[in-house]
Amino acid sequence: MSVILNASVNTKSAVEYRTISSTQSHLAEEQSERLHKWISKDQLEKLHAAFLNTPERHVGIDELRIILEELDITFNDSMYTRLFLKINQNRDFKVDWNEFVSYLIFGFQEEDPSSQKESLILPISGPPMVRKSEHRSAICCLALLKAKSDQVPIDEVTETINFSFGGEDSPEASGMWVTASHEGMMRFWTSHMEPIRTASSESIVSTYAFYNNGKVHSKLILGDYAGNVRILSYSPHLRGPFQAKPGAALIEVIWSDVLKGKIPQFFPKEYINLHNEMISCVYFSLHMNALFASAEYRNTKKYRGRCPGMIMVNYDERSNFRIPLGVSTFFVAESHNIVVTGGPDTFVRIWDVYIPTEPSAILTGHNGGIVLVFVQPEENKVYSVDYQKIIKVWDLHEHTLLQTYGDLVRLIHHSETDMTYYYHSHLQELVVAGRKLISIKCCPRVRVDLADGNTHAAPVSVVLYNRLFRNVVSCGLDSYIIVWDPWTGRRKIIMKSCHTKMIYGEIIDIEITAACFDPLEQFLLTGARDGSLKIWNYNNAVVVRNMSIMPDQEVTAVIWVVDRILPMGWDWQVTEFNDVVGREYGDPKKWPKFHTDDITCADVKLGEGVVTATYSGEIIFWKLETGQPYRRYSVMDPTRFIELKLTAEEEKFIRQSKRLASRPTPGNHGLQMGRAGRSTVLNRPEDNRDYGTDIPISVQAVLFLQTRPQTLKHGSVFISLDTGFIQVYSHHQRGGYMVEFLAVHKTGDCVLTMCTDRKNRYLYTGTAFGYIKVWHIENFCVPETEKIHVCMPKLRLEFIFLRKELFLTRAKRAVRNQAEPLLVSSYKGHLKAINSISFINLPKIIFTGSHDYSCRLWTQGGRYLGTLGTVLPWSKLTPFERAGNDNHLYRMPPDIKKVASSTTLKVISGIQAETRIKISDGKPVEDREEDTAQTEDVTELRKLLDKPVKEPILGKHFELPGRSVLDQHIELDTTQSYIAVFTQLKVHSTEMLERLPTPAVVSRVQTENYLDHYIPVEGKVDVSGSAINIKQPSRRRSDKTNDTRNVRTPRARDLIALEMSSSHASQS
């Protein structure tokens, strides 16, 4: 049975829209619909001439087919209908020359490899890691100690891929950091800035690197204050000249002796007066066998801008890169043959190493001198840091600014200006050293051992499959719309900042919360959190139309039927927009406001009705043609009849609006008054209703079964509640609630999204805990006469979840008493909530969008196919063949592998772990003995668990204490919602302990006074000597009159104390 959908009621064309799931369910081979691959230049000129010869300069569906057939470009009926709908972007069923050429251009744009490299997030998006330097002064030197140099010989260079398997964390690959300060302290750190040890040095430390390849000589490059550059080469074999010699702990070498060749292991080379100023930076390129040296020329009156800021020396040839004020730092990208320089003039220049006369690009934007530049060739990005600690990221090819990062200004005190920088090319980290150690991730590699990558930079809200273009469209809370090719895993188009809002002069991205396609699936409709709606021609990222419901009211659901658009959300009602040519920009129609809370979800049955549900559990069925409600339910009491009745104020408003509409007023004055009055009435709170208030159960998702008729005995609407149950209703006028079933197996979980296949045989659900469940609903809530026989062996071949196990798993235990619907698959697909789920009919592929930023593809049986946006190779898929192969070994998502249960492992891997072992006579003796041992183990385990264990359970090694004679019966208080356990405890009163007498020695120590043993010391300074002579006075006599303890009155004690202090002051 084919699915036919007319484009418009006013259209005379007989275009029928058939999907690949219609009568033409399979093709002999995949036919390409991309005309840009077929049409040559001569054919294109003939097509242009044919368009010009037409009377109205545009052709219809039949005329275009005739023109293409004259050029030997033929299609079958189904493929040509799809092609015509793709070309006809104006939806008038007439194609002009501009539309035809635009379609050819879109074909080339889809194959543009630059669209694959555009990043979803900023290059520096993660927070920096800050540590104390643990040095007494600021760090003056920062180096990386590695076993292998960053420069790799040419024969060992491989293609760089931006993902890793976690091997860079090892010390052999990432090395360790070494920091040094002016007081001579050196500290060693791991690659993740964990301290290892501390050392001290009294001399200047120079750094050098060894090449593991003994054929390549190591080079120590020295630049001095006079502008000279010296190169010292030596062989790294057996540590070269740095071998330890007996009897000599330190070997001192004089440069003149090295030049004279007295040390044969050194090969020196000098470049005298290479620069006229101090050498600021040197580098030797192993690939180009060239030396780069730079210097700063700040004396503009002396050099007048004609200074060679950087010089490249290749053998005896010199290339001068003339830059005003010279060069402070540079970076050589050998894979691209470019040099990036930065200096005091605040400009970043990109040079071709073979064209030193003029830079390829000049990047402006810094307000201070450049202190560091480095390049990421695999990411095509240039990073620059200025004196004011501002980091800017540039695109290497387009020469545009991508990001300005200013967090270093906040983390580092403004008085710290001399900072030390080092870029770790292997870990892709920038380390800034001063009083603190700060590590910044710069486009970090994806750890494929932890995750497969992300589809969006924020949670995915909606995923849709377009049957016309055969692609997947994902929308996220990052305000991105991304078009994916699910058959190759490529990203076709990315649209950023789709919904925006200006707040205090700053443009803020608004989250996309709802989306759908038009009936012919040519355009995309999106709704945002601020109530805005946009219609997109998502093939060229052009906004066709802007709409809006009430301001700052989130759009939770959008429905697009023929000639009408129905958005709804937190405004408690349905708003209807026209989609007819000529009436697009009229005022929207507001449906009656019967809801008393925010609308959370909605769905439509073409030609019959619409169902809406709210946060408070209200369900209303509407007539699609008239927009009038005909039934109302509450999920708390679904069998109770609720009358559809407006309040008195709403009825008064309706009569008033009709009277104003019929009154003849000039212009649009009456229309404006009607809108004003409507806004004042609809914005009021409706707390006076006696139903639907304070209901704790909310509706999370609704689903219409399109193939089920509108009868009393057919359950056609599925309602998902936050309690984990799914209620089934009939949308007939006299229908209602039929049955409910539990759709989750964990406490607190609930179904957030649902979808079905084309024939409504299976129900696919995604839960808040990340579980994907598949239900067989073909015989669920249908009359007995329409039920069919279910072949369970066939289902077990497709769904491994149904195969028997030794123990009943948790997902099966939850539905063991539930006859219908039949749970055929259950597994954990995401770590976080699944916000959207959809299904592709012919290849039987499920794709889910989750709160964990990813969109994943699965087979109907539960095998994992991949994540959109992954860096790993993509599985071979086609829209004309069923996905999944029983002989193929499928892998698991790395994040799910760590938390997967036995059921998830079995379903995703497709391997039954527990199988019965049978012994065959043809096996060797050793295999028979091993199989016999395994069989005996399984048999003993089943004997142990099939019947109660005999006493004593714990053996003879432990005996339980005997019970008391009196059996204490505890009566629990169950009147409240919880049981207070502490009220059931028996509390014994405490008794005072007998206090032992205090020993005489302790009593005597307690009564002692330290003043009895205190003897003051007099100190007098002898002027003649340099030391202080301490004179000890004679022991003070014990005078009872001066003892304050013998004085009875407080006043007398105060007088004696004052007298004693005055005497001490006079003596001193």
UniProtKB/Swiss-Prot annotation:
The lineage of its organism: Eukaryota, Metazoa, Ecdysozoa, Arthropoda, Hexapoda. Keywords: Repeat, WD repeat. The keyword Repeat applies. Residues 657-687, 1026-1068 are annotated as: Disordered. This is WD repeat-containing protein on Y chromosome. Pfam families: WD40. WD repeats lie at residues 155-199, 201-242, 322-361, 365-404, 455-494, 507-546, 594-634, 746-785, 829-868. Residues 1039-1056 have a biased composition (Basic and acidic residues). InterPro entries: EF-hand-dom_pair, WD-EF-hand_domain, WD40/YVTN_repeat-like_dom_sf, WD40_repeat_dom_sf, WD40_rpt. It comes from Drosophila yakuba (Fruit fly). SUPFAM superfamilies: EF-hand (SSF47473), WD40 repeat-like (SSF50978). PANTHER family: EF-HAND CALCIUM BINDING DOMAIN 8 (PTHR44324:SF6), WD40 REPEAT DOMAIN 95 (PTHR44324).
